[in-house]
């Protein structure tokens, strides 16, 4: 008989969240006491907007670099299939506020300081879909998201600075 599982993200009521936000999904504890934290980094409002794949792909590549420059312990930052944001997996305990500040700072750099030469992993050797990138779209989305501010609470807007 298959094991009964509950997928947390499918239990979240996507109609009541207020993006953009960072939400702590879970803290997982390993057998030796290691902690892994999983965050919902929601950049656009579910079922109202979706970031096109080329822009999302470029944001993904940039966040892989920029987050690691700002905070230790990043394991992975992967886009949601719905294209509204990312899962951010981290070693150790981190607050939604700290992660929201890191994401804000990273998006500020994308919006204002990044050139094509700064985008990592854009060659046929380093990317599985290297033709599907758009720095223009990444910058446009970063600016739109920053205008709204990133909240550390998914249900009540509390924008971090």
Swiss-Prot record:
Name the Enzyme Commission number(s) assigned to this protein: 4.4.1.21
Record's superkingdom? Answer: Bacteria
Which parts of the sequence bind Fe cation?
Answer: 57, 61, 127
What cofactors does this protein use? Fe cation
Q: What InterPro entries does UniProt report for this protein, alphabetically?
A: LuxS_sf, Metalloenz_LuxS/M16, S-ribosylhomocysteinase
Quote the catalytic activity from the record.
S-(5-deoxy-D-ribos-5-yl)-L-homocysteine = (S)-4,5-dihydroxypentane-2,3-dione + L-homocysteine
The entry's family comment says: Belongs to the LuxS family.
**Protein's recorded name:** S-ribosylhomocysteine lyase
The organism named in the record is Streptococcus equi subsp. zooepidemicus (strain H70)
């Amino acid at each position: 008989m298959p094991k009964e599982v509950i997928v947390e993200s499918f239990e979240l009521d996507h109609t009541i969240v207020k993006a953009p936000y960072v939400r702590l999904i879970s803290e997982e504890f390993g057998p030796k006491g290691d902690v892994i934290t999983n965050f919902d980094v929601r950049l656009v409002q579910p079922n109202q907007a979706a970031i096109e794949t080329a822009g999302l792909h470029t944001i993904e590549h940039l966040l892989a670099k920029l987050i690691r420059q700002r905070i230790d312990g990043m394991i992975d930052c992967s886009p949601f299939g719905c294209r509204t944001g990312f899962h951010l997996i981290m070693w150790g305990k981190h607050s939604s506020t700290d992660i929201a500040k890191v994401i804000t700072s990273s998006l500020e750099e994308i919006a204002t300081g990044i050139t094509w030469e700064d985008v990592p992993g854009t060659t046929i050797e380093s990317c599985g879909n290297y033709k599907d990138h758009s720095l223009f779209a990444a910058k446009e989305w970063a600016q739109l998201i920053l205008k709204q501010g990133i909240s550390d609470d998914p249900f009540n807007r509390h924008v971090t600075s």
